[in-house]
Amino acid sequence: MSDTKKSFKNVLEFVHKFRRKNKIKREISDIEKKIRDNQKRILLLDNLIQYITLDMNYEEIKKIIFMMKSDYEDRIDDYIVKNAELSKEKRNLSKELKFIIK
């Protein structure tokens, strides 16, 4: 393969990895926002539990709230895992980009 073709291939690879890195950066930001939103929902549900009175069919309402809280906690866990995976891929792409530049 000629040097020109190698260089062109390297440029294409660099552009592809750089775009992927930026996309991952945006996804990480989006996931962090989702984590914050769900943490706020958990706090809201915790506060709501404190205000429920016995004359409101307490056990049923409390059961529903606990189920909702559990769902939000599961979502946060999923987002944290996905965020970690994306961060790892982003780090690897950064290393590869540095290697291509040199």
Swiss-Prot record:
Any one GO CC term of the record: cytosol
Question: Where, subcellularly, is it found?
Answer: Cytoplasm
Which region is the signal sequence?
A: none
Tell me which UniProt keywords the record has, alphabetically.
Answer: Coiled coil, Cytoplasm
> InterPro entries given for it?
DUF496
Which ranges of the sequence are coiled-coil? 69-96
The superkingdom listed in its UniProt entry is Bacteria
Cited NCBIfam families? PRK05423.1 (NF003844)
Please give the family membership noted in the entry.
Belongs to the pole-localizer TmaR family.
Functional summary from the UniProt entry: Pole-localizer protein involved in the regulation of several cellular processes.
**What is the protein's given name?**
Pole-localizer protein TmaR
Task: List the source organism.
Answer: Buchnera aphidicola subsp. Acyrthosiphon pisum (strain APS) (Acyrthosiphon pisum symbiotic bacterium)
Lineage of source species: Bacteria, Pseudomonadati, Pseudomonadota, Gammaproteobacteria, Enterobacterales
Annotated gene = tmaR
